[in-house]
Amino acid sequence: MPGKPYHGDVCVNECPNYGIMLSVFSWPGHSQTRHTSLTAVLGHKDGTSMVQNTMRPRQRRRGSSAAQFVRLSALALIVSWTGLLFFVWATPSRRASAEPVPLASEFPLRDAARRAREAARIAAAASAEQRQSAPSAKHDTEAQPLDAVAPLAVHQERDGFTMERDEQTGLLVPTFWEPPVGVDELAHVDAVNGEPTIFLMIASYRDWQCRDTAASALARATHPRRVVVAAVQQNRPGDVGCADPPVPCSEDPHQPLCKYSSQVRVYAMDANDATGPVYARHVGYRMYRGEAFALQVDAHCVFVNGWDVGIIDQWKRTRNEMAVLSTYLTDLEGSVSPSGDSLRKTRPIMCNSDFEGSPGYLRHGAQPERVPAIRDVPMLQPYWAAGFSFARGHFVHRVRYDCCLPMVFMGEEISIGVRAWTHGYDMYAPQASVLFHEYAQKSSRRRHVPKFWESKGARRANGQKSLRRLTSLIKMAPPDMPDDWDRTKASLYGLGTDRPVDLFYKLALVDVSRRSAVPLCQFVDSGDMHRMLHDAHLRADGRGIDYTGAARQLDVMKVIDKRLYDPISNQLRRAVERGDKNLARNALSEAQRTKLEKHHPELRELVDEARRLKGAQRS
């Protein structure tokens, strides 16, 4: 067939018992005919499944009759009232619980009313769309399949997606979810059978473990019915899909991906269109539909038993509606028992970052992993990690992944973290790990998993231009950087207004102009940051830490000096006074590791004396 196919997929839950995945491929270049492949994957609640594929020429639609318009309008009215009645009398499997999530204050659940309003809104929008676009009367009785190239009208089922054309990629993507009109977004709590729902987002590039990650989450959750898996799958023909069970559901309907198939949503992209994890996660955030909590993980993780109850309990312990639990996950090796329980008492904490390369971009380094200094609650930290992020669902809506950062890998962590802080969110290291990561460095079977930069889309992208956009949006651009960065939707993907970004850089000891950052681990890992900011300045209503008063004046460098640099400088002085070469060698090693001279240039003469004692030249 001529031309390259345009590809857009949507997974739609048509009813509580069935899930439908629509895969649409359209080839341009036909004057009167478009060829459309429509793939429907039906998953029944009993675990059975059926796949239907059709390929047929489709005549270009020229119009619809006035009679059809009248019928559609009447149908829209019937659907709206039917939706209202259904959600009023529906079984409690998808209705709001009368028992809200106990947060800083009690928030009512408005799930049933919200869904009724949403059903009426969708039907009204469909009717309005038909009225607006109705052409002159023409007899056309053939049902038309979804066309990925033609302009798209409203197309949404009760738990499905409204799709729109992405201006940057040309792909059909889900529209962003918006909170119900008149409802406080921070108070919105979605629930299933009284349990708050969890949106689990996985971005996967040709990763055969994506399905194992999803299955692990569903199998080991205490309340699996509340978990909604949203996978952005970037595959080539023959690759294992994120929703593909190891064996057909007809042979084993009890597999997690069969038993809970209606809760697994897959957005399928051609791997050739991939430009890195940022865009994939951007699409993943578009799949969010108002769930109470949002969890973002990589496609090669293993969950522990009861992870859903455990992580929500940890989040509640912060007493902070704006808490985001995030860290670099511990390696899987030696972390999970055969029965699915955690074997670890340690956890990593995000505190070590510095500028790398030229002109210098802030990157996270290796993070310390120890038994928490404060054991009964997640500990406050300055930074955010993409491989594990757990927060209330409004985080996904308010701090959206940027649409326009192709070829950026890891750099988006600084962007999301800084933007989130300016939107009022606070980062915490989890109290205990509820899942673990299989790193390629320790797993031979992962060393041959393809990387996104092999794709044609990645080769066409400009990573340096993306980094200019990323740093400019968070006011971290180098002073002499060219001003030709992409300003597409800069206000949507820029900073928040709850806190000034300059205050974040001040408290995190990040000097943007000098391209330097002080290591914060002595301040963070000791629990000082948590005690000085969380304990002292958490708002009474639990909606974030208050940085408008005394917290703004906190002298973090004084704490770092006391815990880190003062002991090193004292050790250097003792070495010089005693003429102890071994002590000088150890002190110089610490001075180099912590960049003592860079952050305290007044100590350079002392460091030089220690070097002369050691017999080494200054590097």
Regions found by a protein language model. Name each.
Residues 93-144:
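N-terminal, immediately post-signal peptide pro-regions of secreted/luminal proteins
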Residues 480-562:
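Non-catalytic, C-terminal membrane-associated alpha-helical segments of glycosyltransferases
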Residues 569-577:
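Amphipathic alpha-helical repeat scaffolds
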